[in-house]
């Protein structure tokens, strides 16, 4: 870890290093590390809330999530017949994973508020592809090819099983759930186990680059069938310019009261300015930086046209790093950002001229 990484106010603290130690608890001897490209995970790293900003319509979608979130009684009610599926869709790099983690943070808080009246249910959170939500972890086979759907579903259950075992659920019951060939039966057995231990499951399912649109539709439907009472699945769906996941999700799961669809869209003119406030606080101020220049950053949108939230964070991180050596405090404005976005733009142009061959599989 370099001193610039340590000091950079736009770096995101990695929860317990990266995806956490094996036991799921912080290591008192571990040194904090920061990244220019890590999702915000406030349910695991509370100070990530300080870096949450409403970019790419995420605030609007968070309000939608909270408005549709069921009561704790409804989540626990085995007679309701339904669990819940929350689908977050949008272009790559737009902050879908951060929005999912923020939704889980809010859901855990709501569960905690009503916990005493419900016997203090345990909320078990399982990012099945790690906190970065990297679908390759579960969608690529041992030989590097795309894994069969059955293997993907089994891997998801194995990740859930690991977390249940850490919470001292009966090993024999957990192993039988993984071994069950019928996914619907497996999640039904999981529901029974959660009910017996007064627990809830919040599982995060990553975006998977399906080789066939029909497989993706079938997988989304299987997620809905897997969402039994006490089980909430948060499913990430990325899409490119050639397709609209919003329409696909609506057509696939139309009319189900158990589904909440959150759709992120393109950045607007205010998002550069909004993102400038995602700096970590330090010594009572935003990491030693001068208050960002609003008019300059709003005007920069038409010149820069950032492609996604990931690009915003990397450019701000790079600019803040460069400003550390300035002889006096310097505002994050268009002039400070321009050299860094121009470098990225040149890199994109180079890739368009000489594209990298696509990877096989997920």
Residue spans for each PLM region:
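C-terminal alpha-helical "lid" subdomain
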Residues: 2-42, 47, 61, 265-362
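N-terminal pre-Walker A segment at the start of P-loop NTPase domains
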Residues: 39-74
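Walker A/P-loop nucleotide-binding motif
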Residues: 80-102
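Residue-level preference for the first positions of well-ordered beta-strands
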Residues: 83-87, 199-202, 232
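The catalytic "switch" region of P-loop NTPases
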Residues: 92, 135-140, 199, 211-304
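Hydrophobic residues on the short alpha-helix immediately C-terminal to a glycine-rich phosphate/catalytic loop
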Residues: 103-107
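Conserved catalytic segments around the Walker B and adjacent sensor/switch elements
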Residues: 110-143
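Mid-core helix/loop region of P-loop NTP-binding domains shared across ATPases and GTPases
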Residues: 151-228, 288-303, 312
């Amino acid at each position: 870890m370099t001193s610039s990484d340590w000091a950079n106010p736009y770096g995101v603290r990695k929860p317990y290093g990266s995806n956490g130690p094996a036991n799921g608890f912080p290591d008192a001897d571990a040194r904090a590390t920061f990244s220019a490209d890590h999702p915000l995970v406030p349910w695991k790293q509370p100070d990530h809330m300080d870096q949450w900003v409403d970019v790419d319509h995420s605030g609007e979608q968070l309000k939608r999530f909270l408005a549709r979130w069921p009561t704790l009684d409804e989540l626990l009610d085995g007679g309701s017949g339904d669990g819940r599926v929350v689908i977050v869709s949008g272009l790559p790099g737009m902050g879908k994973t951060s929005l999912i983690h923020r939704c889980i943070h809010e859901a855990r808080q709501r569960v905690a508020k009503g916990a005493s009246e419900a016997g203090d249910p345990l909320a078990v959170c399982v990012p099945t592809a790690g906190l970065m939500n990297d679908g390759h972890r579960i969608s690529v086979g041992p030989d590097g090819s795309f894994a069969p759907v059955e293997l993907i579903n089994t891997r998801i259950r194995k990740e859930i099983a690991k977390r249940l075992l850490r919470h001292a659920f009966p090993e024999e019951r957990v192993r039988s759930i993984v071994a069950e060939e019928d996914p619907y039966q497996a999640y039904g057995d999981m529901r029974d186990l959660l009910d017996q231990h007064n627990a809830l499951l919040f599982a995060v399912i990553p975006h998977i680059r399906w080789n066939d649109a029909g497989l993706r539709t079938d997988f989304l439907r299987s997620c809905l069938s897997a969402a039994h009472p006490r089980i909430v699945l948060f499913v990430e769906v990325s899409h490119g310019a050639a397709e609209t996941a919003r329409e696909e999700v609506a057509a696939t799961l139309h009319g189900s009261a158990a589904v909440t669809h959150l759709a992120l869209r393109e950045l607007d003119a205010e998002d550069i300015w909004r993102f400038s406030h995602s700096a970590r606080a330090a010594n009572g101020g935003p990491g030693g930086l001068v208050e960002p220049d609003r008019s300059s950053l709003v005007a920069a949108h038409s010149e820069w046209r950032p492609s996604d939230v990931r690009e915003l964070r990397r450019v701000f991180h790079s600019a803040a790093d460069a400003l550390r050596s300035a002889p006096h405090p310097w505002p994050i404005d268009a002039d400070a950002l321009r050299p860094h976005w121009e470098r990225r733009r040149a890199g994109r142009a180079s890739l368009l001229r000489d594209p990298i061959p696509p990877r096989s599989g997920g």
